[in-house]
Structures are given as structure tokens and as C-alpha cells.
Design a protein with these regions (language model features):
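Catalytic machinery of carbohydrate-active enzymes
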Residues: 1-361
Length: 361
């Protein structure tokens, strides 16, 4: 089936399920879909099947009513757990936003007359077998726009994306203010590593950028991310080369959201915090080489601060899921310096004035 046979989502829909389990960046891209669904069907209860990592970012979000955890660290038991959780949860519609086999299997555990997934051309691992309805085929486009295709198929209106991922409550706002005010200059968070080494930039170059941030731009470098072995190794190198930097590794996603929300500018390769910064409307210098930036780069903000090492000079590459190895080393410290200069010319005045208003002592 295609969208021609997908009934419009009723404004009186009561229960909506979402299967998108994996990455933080994907979770960020799902939030505008949830905003549109809630605006269209305000009384609907939205349940989201999600892994523990990204769940920490959206747990407590006022529009996310229920999170069903899929803990892949439990191996095959994770499927038993999530099947048990979904047995007693019938849905009016389920959005299968993920195209891999494990997500298809989880979709099969849901109970709904409409399980809407990707078209056969884009559904990997025979994922289309687990859905009852499919969105129509479409040329490659940004992941955010792909998710909006699901809304279009159900005739759910959507405008400019909304996320609401900044500090939600007084406790988070107090923590944010205390963190920001410990420094005597605006902060510049640096996401020092990702889940894939091929997407990372060299820590020695991050160290050089820290000196530029401190000496030329008057900014406080703050290292952010998790505490994986690669992140800890990168942290050690950067702090050795740039002792003025501060490390906030392992703060957790909600505190990372607060740090990014209070930053003058952020710097990041293609990873979840990059998309979180975009959602927070924090200017972010993005370093992209392994993944296709037309598909996963900054969506609708700070695109002029992106360093594209994926394509060759002048190349009009297609929007697809291809990866390109050994591209990140092409990005030089001078490239990042040039983008910082562009940030100062285009963003810094308004951004720092806003931060001064928000965090004045």
C-alpha cells in the first residue's frame, strides 16, 4: 500500500506509536514530527519505542507521553521485553521511522490497523514486510524531510520544525546558569568524538582550535560528549595541548542540552549534539566528511557554518546514504578558523547580546 490508501489521521486519534529506537540525532529529528502530531491531535497519547541513550534526552518532554525502552544491551531479551510492553498497547497508527530489521521486528510487535513505514525502495532489510502502509517513493532528501513525508501521507499539517529541547524546569535552568556563570567569558562547546571513528576530527587539531577560541575570539572552550575510550583519549590529548579548555564529558544529554543552549558557538562533527545545537538555535560549526551533509547536515540553521569535506570541489553529489572514508583529515585548522571568523561576522553580536541578557549576574 502507498499513501493513496493511508487514511488521514483523525484529529480525535487517541493513541499513536513511534518506532525510532537508535541515535540521538534521529531522536532530535523525530521531535518536529511529534510537535505536528500533537498540534493536529491534541488528545492523542504518544508512545515512543526508544533505546536508553536517546531516551534520556526526551524523557520528561511535555509532548512525549510514554517511552517504551528497547535496551539492546540485553541482546535477544530486549525483544522479549519490548514485545511484552507492547502487548497491551493498541494504537490508532504506528509510525515506523526506522528502516532496519530490528526495528521492523519491533514494529511487528505493535497492534495497529495502520503501521506506516518507508516505501520498498528505502526500507532496508525487507523492513517493508513489517508495515501495512507505506509512504510513496521519493527522491533522496534530508532526514528531517523524510520524516515529514509521514505527516504528509496522513494529511497532518506541519510548518517550520519545532523541538522544545532546551532546559524544561527550574532545576535544569539553575544548573545551566551556575555552569555558565563559572566562566568569565562565553563558552564554546566542542563535541570531541562520535560513535564512529571515521566521523571524528583529530584531537590535536581540536587542541589548536582551543587556542584560537581562547586567544582570538575570547571564548572558553568546553569539551563535551560521553566517556567512551576514544572520547577519554581525545580529552587527554586536547587538555595536554590546550590546558585552558574545560572538560564536561559525561554530563549526560539533558545537561549537554543546557550547555549547548547557553553557548556562544558550538563545534561538532556529524553526531547527535550537532543536531541538538541546531534544534536549540545555537550557532554551530559543523565538520562533515564521512556522511552525506545533504542528507544529515544542519537542517535549517547555520548551514553557512558547515565545512563540507564529503564532496570534491564543485561536485554535485547525490543525496544518498553513501559513506566516504578518510575525508575528515581534509578539514584543516584554518578551515575551522575561517568558519569562526564567519560566525563572528554573522552571528556573534546578536548571540552574545542574548546570552548577556539571559545570564547576567
Amino acid at each position: 500500500m502507498t499513501s493513496s490508501s493511508v487514511p488521514p489521521l483523525s484529529a480525535s486519534a487517541k493513541k499513536i506509536g513511534i518506532v525510532m529506537m537508535s541515535a540521538v540525532g534521529d531522536a532530535v529529528h523525530v521531535m518536529p514530527v511529534i510537535h505536528a502530531l500533537k498540534a493536529h491531535a491534541p488528545s492523542a497519547r504518544i508512545s515512543w519505542v526508544l533505546q536508553p541513550g536517546p531516551a534520556t534526552l526526551v524523557r520528561g518532554h511535555p509532548l512525549v507521553d510514554d517511552i517504551v525502552l528497547f535496551d539492546r544491551s540485553r541482546g535477544w531479551r530486549a525483544f522479549i521485553d519490548v514485545r511484552r510492553e507492547l502487548q497491551s498497547r493498541p494504537f490508532d497508527v504506528v509510525l515506523a521511522l526506522q528502516v532496519y530489521f530490528k526495528a521492523g521486528l519491533v514494529t511487528s510487535f505493535t497492534h495497529s490497523p495502520i503501521k506506516l513505514g518507508f516505501d520498498r525502495e528505502r526500507a532496508r532489510d525487507a523492513n517493508w514486510l513489517f508495515t501495512t502502509h507505506r509512504i510513496p517513493s521519493h527522491a533522496g532528501q534530508h532526514v528531517q524531510d523524510q520524516y515529514f513525508e509521514f505527516l504528509d501521507a496522513m494529511r497532518v499539517p506541519h510548518g517550520a520544525p519545532q523541538w522544545s529541547l532546551g532546559p524544561w524546569n527550574d532545576e535544569e535552568r539553575v544548573w545551566q546558569r551556575d555552569f555558565i556563570q563559572q566562566f568569565d567569558r562565553p563558552i564554546a562547546p566542542i563535541v570531541i568524538a562520535t560513535s564512529k571513528a571515521a566521523k571524528d576530527w583529530m584531537p590535536e587539531r581540536w587542541g589548536a582550535v582551543c587556542h584560537i577560541l581562547w586567544n582570538e575570539f575570547g571564548l572558553q572552550p568546553v569539551l563535551v560528549g560521553g566517556r567512551s575510550d576514544r572520547e577519554l583519549a581525545a580529552e587527554a590529548i586536547i587538555l595536554r595541548d590546550a590546558p585552558m579548555a574545560c572538560s564536561a564529558l559525561g554530563s549526560g544529554l539533558r545537561k549537554l542540552s543546557a550547555i549547548l543552549d547557553g553557548a556562544a558557538v558550538a563545534l561538532s562533527p556529524d553526531t547527535g549534539p550537532l543536531h541538538l545545537a541546531i534544534a536549540l538555535r545555537t550557532p554551530v560549526i559543523s565538520l562533515v566528511g564521512y556522511t552525506n551533509p545533504k542528507r544529515v547536515g544542519p537542517y535549517d540553521f547555520a548551514h553557512d557554518l558547515m565545512i563540507d569535506a564529503y564532496g570534491e570541489p564543485g561536485e554535485d553529489y547525490p543525496i544518498d546514504m553513501s559513506y566516504r572514508l578518510d575525508r575528515m583529515p581534509r578539514i584543516s585548522v584554518d578551515d575551522v578558523h575561517a568558519m569562526l571568523t564567519r560566525w563572528r561576522e554573522r552571528y556573534s553580536t546578536a548571540r552574545i547580546a542574548d546570552l548577556a541578557t539571559r545570564y547576567s549576574r
